[in-house]
């Protein structure tokens, strides 16, 4: 098995779990709002974090202690509480399946995408720590190939997720499909 395919399979196996970030990508796909940009931000962020983990794992392993982990978890908690509160506020509004009316600003989508990406502790555990630890004994060129494989999996996954939900949005926006 080549290091590219090893990175691809390993990266894909880590990203397949449906968490807050992936649900947000699906939601943006269903709404048909900034799908390309949301997927790009998620995939490029993964690429940066994957290569950061591969080449700086030893440093991060010593830097991240329980205090830093607690700070990240508290930031994530605050972000998720804000998101939940905003969803509760929308709860009393009638569900609007018309994607043309329900548009939100680019800035709002951008900030939410950045929040779901960088305030998510699983992003760091998967990209920086797991992939970094997995590849720590690889030669330099093998690390690059491994990172390219994992990053390719991320790009394919996010764009497939975003545009598949966009493609199926008419079905998913049908009130009968949710009953």
Residues covered by each model-derived region:
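Hydrophobic/aromatic residues within the transmembrane alpha-helices of Major Facilitator Superfamily
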Residues: 8, 12, 16, 85, ...
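Flexible interhelical linker loops that connect adjacent transmembrane helices
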Residues: 92-108
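Selective transmembrane alpha-helices of multi-pass membrane proteins
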Residues: 64-95, 151-161, 169-179
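Juxtamembrane transmembrane-helix termini in multi-pass membrane transport proteins
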Residues: 2-67, 128-145
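Selected transmembrane alpha-helices and immediately adjacent juxtamembrane segments
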Residues: 1, 106-127
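Alpha-helical transmembrane segments and their lipid-water interface positions
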Residues: 45-57, 83, 124, 157-165
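Small-residue packing motifs within transmembrane alpha-helices
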Residues: 3, 7, 69, 73, ...
């Amino acid at each position: 098995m080549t290091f590219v395919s090893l990175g691809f399979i390993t990266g894909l196996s880590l990203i397949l779990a449906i968490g807050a970030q992936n649900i947000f990508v699906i939601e943006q796909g269903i709404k048909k709002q900034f799908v390309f940009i949301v997927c790009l931000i998620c995939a490029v962020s993964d690429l940066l974090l994957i290569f950061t983990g591969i080449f700086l794992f030893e440093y991060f392993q010593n830097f991240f202690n329980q205090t830093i982990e607690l700070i990240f978890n508290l930031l994530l908690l605050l972000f998720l509480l804000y998101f939940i509160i905003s969803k509760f506020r929308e709860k009393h509004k009638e569900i609007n399946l018309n994607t043309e009316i329900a548009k939100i600003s680019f800035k709002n989508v951008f900030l939410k995408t950045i929040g779901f990406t960088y305030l998510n502790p699983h992003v760091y555990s998967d990209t920086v720590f797991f992939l970094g630890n997995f590849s720590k004994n690889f030669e330099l060129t093998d690390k690059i190939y491994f990172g390219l494989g994992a990053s390719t999996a991320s790009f394919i996954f996010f764009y497939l997720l975003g545009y598949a939900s966009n493609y199926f949005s008419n079905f998913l926006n049908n009130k009968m499909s949710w009953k």
